[in-house]
From Swiss-Prot:
Belongs to the bacterial CoaD family. It is found in: Cytoplasm. The lineage of its organism: Bacteria, Pseudomonadati, Pseudomonadota, Alphaproteobacteria, Rhodobacterales. ATP binds at T9, F10, H17, G93, L94, R95, E103, R128, Q129, A130, I131, A132, S133, K134. This is Phosphopantetheine adenylyltransferase. It comes from Paracoccus denitrificans (strain Pd 1222). Homohexamer. The keyword Ribonucleoprotein does not apply. The gene is coaD. Pathway: Cofactor biosynthesis; coenzyme A biosynthesis; CoA from (R)-pantothenate: step 4/5. Its cofactor is Mg(2+). The record marks H17 as: Transition state stabilizer.
Length: 164
């Protein structure tokens, strides 16, 4: 069984993330969505909320197109998480050249720690390239409409968070 790991903070999960998830499902038998706890970031949503949102969106994807998705929160090194879930491939989405520079460094470090785990890059769909969780949160914070960037469930969570 080919297991892939798609890691991220998913704060919140966007339509861009969902596009990568759907396409990654075509490449592996099981896709693990690693919801990261990153001490260098201050997430808007608690880990439990992010996991719940990711799980809900992934359940919709599986119901619509099949496949197997597991949502797995993690706090350790990405390469250790990949080993923990039995992944042989790490899936990363790229939106722009700036993403590639960072990802290129990460691949080098991960390969130095375990060269048996491959990294695969999926280019963001042209319609989704501009979507970034950080920008979505800013638009929502300022009262803008984020429905072109996130699902209705995530939109409602953002509206609820900023209505406080």
């Amino acid at each position: 069984m080919r297991i892939g790991l798609y890691p991220g903070t998913f704060d919140p999960i966007t339509l861009g993330h969902q596009d990568i998830i759907q396409r990654a499902l075509e490449l592996v038998d099981r896709l693990v969505i690693g919801v990261a706890i990153n001490r260098d970031k201050s997430p808007l949503f608690a880990l439990e909320d992010r996991v719940a949102m990711v799980r809900e969106e992934c359940d919709r994807i599986v119901a619509k197109r099949g496949g197997e998705i597991v949502v797995h929160p993690f706090e350790n090194l990405l390469i250790d998480c990949a080993r923990d879930v039995g992944a042989t491939v790490i899936v990363r989405g790229l939106r722009a050249v700036a993403d590639f520079e960072y990802e290129f460094q990460m691949v080098g470090m991960n390969r130095a720690m375990d060269d048996s785990i491959e990294t695969v890059f999926l280019m963001a769909d042209a319609r989704r390239q501009a979507i970034a969780s950080k920008l979505v949160k800013e638009i929502a914070r300022l009262g803008g409409d984020v429905s072109k960037f996130v699902s209705p469930t995530v939109r409602d969570a953002l509206v609820g968070r900023f209505a406080r």
